[in-house]
Amino acid sequence: MTQFSALALLLIVFVAASFAQSYDDVSAEKRAMRNALVRFGRASGGMRNALVRFGKRSPLDEEDFAPESPLQGKRNGAPQPFVRFGRSGQLDHMHDLLSTLQKLKFANNK
């Protein structure tokens, strides 16, 4: 075998390995989307809702996990249900919490 053919063969092997690796990345992405469809149910809207619920999440930075970060409460929280026209604001949840605490305090004072 000449040096040229050995070099060409080596180049072909490297190119094939790089294509196989990129195919594995796509395969993992497809598997994640398939799992999302199964998790959220095919009858409840199919691929579109799975994409909205599961899809294109941005990677979180280290400062997102700081105690003062607004994302800290969502770090280990359950996934929120899909709402067509938006989600309820944080103020609603705060109001519910405060009213519950006031009721408990009032009940303890009696």
Swiss-Prot record:
The keyword Protein transport does not apply. One of its GO terms (molecular function) is neuropeptide receptor binding. The keyword Signal applies. Disruption phenotype: Does not affect the body bend swimming frequency of animals. Exhibits normal pre-molting cessation of pumping. Larval locomotion quiescence reduced significantly and nose immobility reduced to 14% from 48% in wild-type animals. Photoactivation of apft-1 increases nose speed during quiescence in contrast to wild-type animals, which significantly reduce mobility. Shows higher RIS activation at the onset of sleep. Shows diminished RIS-induced body elongation, briefer slowing response and transient stop at the onset of RIS activation. Reverses more immediately after RIS stimulus onset. Residues 23-29, 88-110 form a propeptide. Keywords: Amidation, Cleavage on pair of basic residues, Neuropeptide, Secreted, Signal. Residues 1-22 form the signal peptide. Residues 60-85 are annotated as: Disordered. GO terms for biological process: neuropeptide signaling pathway; sleep. The modification Phenylalanine amide is found at F40, F54, F85. It is found in: Secreted. Each flp gene is expressed in a distinct set of neurons. Flp-11 is expressed in the DD, VD and DVB motor neurons, the PVC and URX interneurons, and the AUA, BAG, DA, LUA, and SAB neurons. Also expressed in head muscle, socket or sheath cells and uterine cells. Expressed exclusively in PHC sensory neurons in males. Expressed in AVK and RIS interneurons. Its main location: secreted. GO terms for cellular component: extracellular region. The modification Glutamine amide is found at Q72. It comes from the Eukaryota. FMRFamides and FMRFamide-like peptides are neuropeptides. Induces sleep-like quiescence behavior following release from RIS interneuron. Helps to sustain locomotion stop after gamma-aminobutyric acid (GABA) induces fast slowing response. Inhibits the late-stage body bend swimming frequency in animals through several receptors including frpr-3, npr-4 and npr-22. Belongs to the FARP (FMRFamide related peptide) family. This is FMRFamide-like neuropeptides 11. It comes from Caenorhabditis elegans. The gene is flp-11.
